[in-house]
Amino acid sequence: MSAQDFLVELGTEELPPKTLVSLADAFLAGIEKGLAGAGLTYSAKQVYAAPRRLAVLITALATQQPDRSVNLDGPPRQAAFDADGNPTQAALGFAKKCGVDLSEIDQSGPKLRYSQTILGKPTTSLLPTIVEDSLNDLPIAKRMRWGARKEEFVRPTQWLVMLFGDQVVDCTILAQSAGRHSRGHRFHHPEDVRISSPAGYLSDLRAANVLADFNERRQIISKRVEELASQQEGTAIVPPSLLDEVAGLVEWPVPLVCSFEERFLDVPQEALITTMQDNQKYFCLLDADGKLLPRFITVANIESKDPAQIIAGNEKVVRPRLTDAEFFFKQDKKQKLETFNDRLKNVVFQAQLGSVFDKAERVSKLAAYIAPRIGGDAQRAARAGLLSKCDLSSEMVGEFPEMQGIAGYYYAKADGEAEDVALALNEQYMPRGAGAELPTTLTGAAVAIADKLDTLVGIFGIGMLPTGSKDPYALRRAALGILRILIEKKLDLNLVETVKFAVTQFGAKVKPAGLAEQVLEFIFDRLRARYEDEGVEVAVYLSVRALQPASALDFDQRVQAVQAFRKLPQAAALAAVNKRVSNLLSKAEGSIAQTVEPKYFDNANEFSLYSAIQQADHAVQPMAAERQYSESLARLAMLREPVDAFFEAVMVNAEDANVRANRYALLARLRGLFLGVADISLLG
């Protein structure tokens, strides 16, 4: 079957840069879906996206649908004809449904059957509907109309190119009649651009100063920004999201170095970086020490004969932004950070849980409780907790919400607070996302845990539990944040006692009955989700959860030990034995003796197992004290041979009551050794 290349390009006014890639990908996916539904084959696909266009190129697309056979089964033969061989209503109805005379129906089989070959349609007749359906299905939050037209799209459309081979696909979509003329750069080449062929699309537009390939523009910007930064003896800050957005703003990227007055460097650099990135889409430069340089890189959409004018224009535009940040910083520093707490008394954290200041006081007390238990200082943690929310009422954070915590750090430093107290004001929000940075100080860790735990207990205490898709207070993230800090920073905190203490801080604001248990279950459920993401089997998690460790660090150490144990050759057999022992002990009548009496042994394998258990117990006790769980399980794995020999030679449920009870006590000792780490029986 013959094939030709297909190109569709929809020209528009400037598309939203932040959604440009997702729109382009959805456009391609829609066309792929349409081609698959029509049974049309092709060899390759490519999507292009620029500020004023979305395009898809399909290589070697079949010129016609394949013919297909359709077989329709009708009523059984005995129901289709009466005793005299005359057709019944069932037969006549089936023929009518098929749109043919009964004589054209196959009557030779057990059922009536109509077979038909449907000829494939020319691809050119199918493409308009496929393209239009794809455009209509784009994920556009809000569509707009323009002029007096009824058509709707994310931006007004300006032109449409649709070529199949060398021919234009005759159609009208979104008020644009298809042709072969695109448009070049708005300033460098405002004239129409004739697209010679689908394969020549990129080169034809390149000649008109348009780089239609999003990834090519992105790479050019990234490489040139890096080169310019190096020339300035700096390193550019290039967040992927900003790079994507800038690549979505320009058709012909030309990065240029600009500068600003050094006096602005007295302002916290995070504020300057935030305003330059978010408002101006600039790439900021850092020196070798990570300090902001008084220079930045802008990406122009034009190759100017006088780039100095573009540079001067950007420097003029950024100055008021930086001046605002400077003003807010100076205004805030006119008073002590602690005085901002007064404003927070009138700011509601949650209607039933009080003000933001109330939360700060709770966090202060909880942080003071946590700090000494993780090796920190209670007084400094309490101080950091009390100051933790102050900057929320500052001018700086009011203008730049991203500065919360960071502004607090600078203001606390200016007030002469201890370094770890100042750092804790920023570290309380860590980790800010999956895989993000953790607190570097114990004071920061204490405040971060306290802040998240206070939110968890408070919101759970008023019954506002997260649902499947709704979690307005980010409780799942809070729980995961607590777990990450404790596990990755190796902080051994008793969560059971800590959560109970946190509950007492709310007084009558919450219903305390069962609250601590509910919060703890939620936290440890997040731990299960964390392990699943890491590829840890649920059975491993459950084997440790059965012991209900109070410390997340202890929990993790046990999980890692069980993971290592599962790789041992004895693991499967010992897991099965533990399950068998667990079942036997659960059926034992009365209480099981705490001690084993060798005088009741009547089999050499009992002596052997007892001796092996005694030796193992002696060996693993110091390991357990040091939480050397992997070593402990590795040592217990040596019990496999005496255990196997015991079960092969010994009947546990002996007729003699004393012998039977003693064997149960022996097995309880065996199981107790493994339960020192995890319930291995759950690994079966």
Curated annotation (Swiss-Prot):
Keywords: Aminoacyl-tRNA synthetase, ATP-binding, Cytoplasm, Ligase, Nucleotide-binding, Protein biosynthesis. One of its GO terms (molecular function) is arginine-tRNA ligase activity. Its main location: cytoplasm. It is found in: Cytoplasm. PROSITE patterns: AA_TRNA_LIGASE_II_GLYAB (PS50861). It is an enzyme of class 6 (ligase). It holds the Pfam family tRNA_synt_2f. Belongs to the class-II aminoacyl-tRNA synthetase family. HAMAP family: Gly_tRNA_synth_beta. Tetramer of two alpha and two beta subunits. This is Glycine--tRNA ligase beta subunit. It comes from Pseudomonas syringae pv. tomato (strain ATCC BAA-871 / DC3000). The lineage of its organism: Bacteria, Pseudomonadati, Pseudomonadota, Gammaproteobacteria, Pseudomonadales. The gene is glyS.
